Amino acid sequence: LIECDEAAFRKASEFLPVECLVVNNIFRDQLDRYGEITHTLNAIREGITHIPDAVLCLNADCSLTASLAEKIPNRVVWFGVNVPIYTHAAHELSDAPYCIHCKTEYQYDYVTYGHLGGFHCPNCGYGRKTPSIAVTQILTAGADASDIVLDICGREYDVHVNLPGGY
């Protein structure tokens, strides 16, 4: 298991025998290194071209991450959160408010954080994929831990997460 910087992944993927790639999300926090979100996205996309046999585990809640599944031969496994994490989530803080394809503003059934959530474009139809691994309920959300219901391919599990907040 290797956690790799987005820009380094572009090159590292040429030399490592990658079996599985997990991409959680793409946020503007990479701007100090890459200048713009599209550069980060393109670095990951280029790296994926070197690993056509790897399984991609992609966050269905992130419109940018989800776009990585387009025009690739890789098998994709989707994960996500099917319910709002925060009742006060502010969509206006979005790093990606507009459709990556047609530039129409996304509509959301719910927002989990920033631009993550149940997004869809009312113009071209691009939208969140149905995840096979998903948080379906948040039972408790404490300062130190949370209890959730996790659905994995149709089977539900009660899970205690030893992390604070929406992690």
Question: Across the structure, where does each feature detected by a protein language model lie?
Answer:
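Conserved substrate/cofactor phosphate-moiety recognition/catalytic segment
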Residues: L1
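Flexible active-site lid/hinge loop adjacent to a nucleotide/diphosphate
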Residues: C4-T112, G165
